């Protein structure tokens, strides 16, 4: 119906004849971009007994966008920090998002379309960059005039990796908008959501077997937010839904969405009505990011619910749900990428050997199991295959430790990551290794950041738990 044609039709409540319009079959569908309210004036007719010709007029108001039960937060890229911790915007996060949304095109530069409403955004906050200018606040009136290069070619260009956010206060979410450009003019506009809470909002993780639905962990989400902010949430808004290849998140009998504010409690439209149903045959990791809202609908923080869908849950006696690497170890063990000791333990704090790390990296990259080529040397087959494929050179000691540099070099080669097209500015001050840079650009490894300086510590060794995190990211990057 159009607005003009509504007045020429009658809509019946209750019994009606064939061909009449039922009142309860009227639906209003708002345009996707519409935010506001629609008013429909009506006259209702009826009565009882001898008073059957009564009528009353009224107005029906349908509100969208700012109405109760609806939320409009957006976060294509999401960060969490605390009131006293400066947040460095990761240029590689933006570059990966750009590639994802353009099916592989490279980010060349971006401009800011908005700045955070709370807190302050700076360029070159620590005054350590040789690109662009000295420390410069970026305000609503100035930010849009600066072009930030992903790979600056001269000192006059502004380096995208030098954007720093300084919080102001606690328990809020704010955002930063941008438009990225490729060399051929392709554009992507997106939003960075920044959550500032008294302490980080803990990830809520659960694991399920293949084909088994999972109820949304409403109570755990409530506890995680309350612990981080000191306040109880009233509702949440989902920021992203599971990929279609993974499964469907339902609210009752209908697919969930990213605009509804799902209340904490029971009943229709509540968090307790959310459940994830994985697709038949799917195994892997699913992340469901959200913002936590107070009773006024204002965000007080952001978090994530993660679900591991596995063939079977394999457990180790020394790895519990509170162990920091529980997610990585559980999913990798189920995928037969990682294993423990004969006594049923995993020993996540033990230093990992070169041979054990080599095996994990190759399996995560898609290599098959390699039988020993030397009697009594468990990992000799992996070393032989790695040498043949150019992943390793020389004769490393398989029972000795492996360094962070060696891990990065083997992993980047195993994943066949490109070492061309990387930013001109190196991400770390203590290594110029291109494989380290490629793996960092892929989001698989990170460094140590302090007062404007990032280091990688290439000669440090790693524990079994630390390598499980790297291998998990590798495996998920190739799914």
Name the predicted role of every residue range:
Residues 1-311:
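Extracellular glycosylation-rich, acidic/polar low-complexity regions of adhesion-
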Residues 36, 223, 284, 339, ...:
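Active-site micro-motifs of SAM-dependent methyltransferase domains
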Residues 40-52, 177-184, 288-293, 399-429, ...:
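Ampipathic, surface-exposed secondary-structure segments
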Residues 93, 111, 220, 237, ...:
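Ca2+-coordinating acidic residues in Ca2+-binding motifs
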Residues 310-326, 334, 339-405, 411-437, ...:
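Feature responds to low-complexity, polar/acidic, surface-exposed segments characteristic
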């Amino acid at each position: 119906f159009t607005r003009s044609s509504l007045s020429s039709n009658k809509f019946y409540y209750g019994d009606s004849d064939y061909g009449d319009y039922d009142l309860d079959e009227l639906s209003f569908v708002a345009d996707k971009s519409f935010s506001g309210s629609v008013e429909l004036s009506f006259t209702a007719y009826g009565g009882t007994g001898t008073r059957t010709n009564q009528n009353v007029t009224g107005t029906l108001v349908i509100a969208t966008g700012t109405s109760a039960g609806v939320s409009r937060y957006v976060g294509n890229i999401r960060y969490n920090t605390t009131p006293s911790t400066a947040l460095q915007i990761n240029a590689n996060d933006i570059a990966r998002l750009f590639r994802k949304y353009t099916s592989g095109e490279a980010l060349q530069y971006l401009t800011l379309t908005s700045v955070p409403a709370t807190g302050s955004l700076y360029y070159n906050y620590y005054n350590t960059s040789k690109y662009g200018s000295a420390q410069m606040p970026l305000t609503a009136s100035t930010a849009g005039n600066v072009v930030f290069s992903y790979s600056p070619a001269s000192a006059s260009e502004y380096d995208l990796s030098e954007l720093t956010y300084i919080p102001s206060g606690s328990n809020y979410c704010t955002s930063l908008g941008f438009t990225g450009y490729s060399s051929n003019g392709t554009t992507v506009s997106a939003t960075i959501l920044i959550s500032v809470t008294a302490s980080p909002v803990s990830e809520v993780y659960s694991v399920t077997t293949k084909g088994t639905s999972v109820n949304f962990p409403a109570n755990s989400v409530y506890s995680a937010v309350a612990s981080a902010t000191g306040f109880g949430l009233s509702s949440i808004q989902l920021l992203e839904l599971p990929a279609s290849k993974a499964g469907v998140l339902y609210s009752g009998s209908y697919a969930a969405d990213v605009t509804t504010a799902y209340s904490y409690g029971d009943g229709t439209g509540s968090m307790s009505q959310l459940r994830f149903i994985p697709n038949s045959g799917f195994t892997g990791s699913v992340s469901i990011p959200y913002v936590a809202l107070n009773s006024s609908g204002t965000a007080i923080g952001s978090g994530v619910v993660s679900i591991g869908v596995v063939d079977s849950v394999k457990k180790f006696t020394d790895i519990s749900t509170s162990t920091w690497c529980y997610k990585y170890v559980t999913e990798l063990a189920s995928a037969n990428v990682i294993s423990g000791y004969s006594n049923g333990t995993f020993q996540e704090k033990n230093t990992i050997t070169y041979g054990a790390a080599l095996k994990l990296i190759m399996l995560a990259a898609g290599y098959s199991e390699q039988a020993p080529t030397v009697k009594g040397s468990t990992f000799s087959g992996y070393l032989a295959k790695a040498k043949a494929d150019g992943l390793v050179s020389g004769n490393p000691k398989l029972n000795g430790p492996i360094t962070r540099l060696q891990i990065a070099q083997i992993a980047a080669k195993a994943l066949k990551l490109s070492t061309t097209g990387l930013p001109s500015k190196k991400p770390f001050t203590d290594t110029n290794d291109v494989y380290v840079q490629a793996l960092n650009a892929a989001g698989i490894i990170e460094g140590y950041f302090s007062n404007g300086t990032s280091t990688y510590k290439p000669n440090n060794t790693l524990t079994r738990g630390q390598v499980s995190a790297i291998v998990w990211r590798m495996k998920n990057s190739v799914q």
